[in-house]
Each structure stands twice: as C-alpha cells, then as structure tokens.
C-alpha cells in the first residue's frame, strides 16, 4: 500500500504527521509526505533519516487560513493532482480538509484538526463577521468535507463542531491522536512546579489565566513569543512575567529534548485552552506522568474523563484553587498523575492511532475495488 500524506510545518499537525508516517513506515507502508507552510529546518526532519519507504516533498505553499492562502490553494491543489498522477498512490490522507474534493481517482481521507470558524466562536462567542474571504474559506471547507470519501476528527466534539459549521460528510470517523510513550520519561523525580505550553497572547490557549491570581507553585510557560506579550505584563531581564501577585517564567520555543525534560520534571500540567479539539501537549504531559488540570470544556472532558482535575470554565480563581489543591496534597497530585498516565497508555498511543488509520485505509480500498 502506498499512502500520500499532507502536513504543515507550522502547527502541531507536524508532530501528528511524524507519528503517523513513522508508524506507517515501520509496518512496511510506502509513504509520500508533502509539507506546506514553510520548508522545515534540518532539526524538524531529522526523524526521517532512519525511515525506509518515505519520499518527502517539502513545499512552501501557504495554508488556507494564512495571508494569500487563497491563491496558494489553487496552486497546491494542482501540485497535488499532478503528484498523484506521477506517483500513483493507493490512498490520499490530507490533513487539510480543503483538498477533500481534489479531482483524483483514489480514496480521499481528510482530517480536521481544527478550523478557523470554530476557533473564532470559542474565543469570541459568535461567528466572525461575514466577508468575501470568510465565504471563500467556508466554501472550500464545505466542498472538501462533502467531497472526501471519509472525514476524520481527533475528538467527537470536533466532529460535531465540523458538521455544524460545514455540513455532514459522506462518512465520518473519530480517531484520537496518539503519541509513542517511548519518547517520554514518567520516572523522574518531580519538582513542585506547573507547566503550560503555548503563546501567552493566544486567546484560544488562554494562558493568561495563569498570570491573574497568586499561585502557590512556580509556573513555566513554554513556547512564548516574548515580543508579542501584551504590554501590561512587564518583562524583566531574567525573562519572567512579574507583578505584585504573580511570577511566571517564560521560555521561548524549546527543542523536543528540552521540552521532554520540562515535562518529566513538572508535577502539574495546566491545559487552559478555551478552544482545544484534542491537545497534544496535554497528552505528552500525561505520558510524562504529570497531573493534569484542565479547563472544563467539552473536548477536554471527552479526552480526559475523570483522570484530570477541572477548573470552572475560563475562571482564573478556580484555576488557582485547583493548583493550590494539588500543591497541598502530594498523594492526590500523584494519584491524578497516575490516572492521566494510565489513560494515555490505554487510549492515546501512536500504535492504536496507526491501527485505526490502517483499518480505514483498507476499508476504503475494499469499497473502491468493489465499486
């Protein structure tokens, strides 16, 4: 079997694609991987060096939600159609739903990791104002979802949201994201500290909740673009957000090795997002045996069930209370860490994810052959 996979190098889809492609290649599946967004740096592609059966085609086509993405979508669609004719794969696995109606003769799977309209609704409480660009965006997503042979989402919440925004697909399937637990160390002695990952200014990630109340433990936010931090949060020379009430350490983007160390040493991971179709970073924290404190939103409830501690939706006071609760009760903190770790091992491994995608590929190929 030969699978064409698309990914982008700008978001967490790149991590997802690495797990997918590595898992497929390890099972003898031939993969052609096309990336969009930016041509990746060498450290982003080092994982490919030992893979057999991988043909990698980096491009700089912009994504549909980016500036000038509309023009690039036409060009990237033509590129993909030409590539399919050249390499003749058996299945197309597009991680951008806008390609679901690409005029090719093989089964087309699209995966909707997130989308602009549902992000806007979660952040602003209403749909974005109508514009020519928004009508174009909604149209290409609706056509892609209607045209695909199968539409995948990383949570049931995301699938329901997708259908309400863009219409029902011909066939839908929820396949939860997965990570390989071998990358993470759950056995390191923990520091009494809190970790969160994301940009402080990102309204969807809502990490500013961690700066609004006095907290009993040191907090580290990773992946912050310091020049974009709002002006009311003064940045000292030692790279900390410091006010009378809060002291939060900010770290710029980390390598995977650096981030794994931070996960392994932190006792608590906080998922503050008000928009989160899955949360790969929370999963990585769970594999590192961090207790998870999560915003009480439907998608995080779906993923973590009763294995996380939840704070009242978007409420900084409740978040501070839950951090205080775990900081004052080591047994409870370790119990929740163990629960999150077990749930990750049972439900969200890369192996399980690959199994489900292979089943979907085979089913679509069988239907295609029988048609």
Q: Whereabouts are the PLM-identified features?
A:
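Active-site proximal beta-strand in glycosyltransferases
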Residues: 91, 103-127, 152
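Membrane-proximal helix-turn-helix segments that form the acceptor-binding/catalytic region
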Residues: 130-151
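Short alpha-helical donor nucleotide-sugar binding micro-motif in glycosyltransferases
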Residues: 145, 261-266
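Helix-loop-beta element that forms the nucleotide-linked donor phosphate-binding surface
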Residues: 146-147, 153, 159-179, 187
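Conserved donor-binding/catalytic core segment of Leloir-type glycosyltransferases
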Residues: 188-205, 209-223
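Aromatic "clamp/platform" in nucleotide-sugar-dependent glycosyltransferases that forms part
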Residues: 274
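Short hydrophobic beta-strand element within catalytic cores of glycosyltransferases
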Residues: 291-294
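Conserved acidic donor-binding segment of nucleotide-sugar-dependent glycosyltransferases
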Residues: 308-317, 325-331
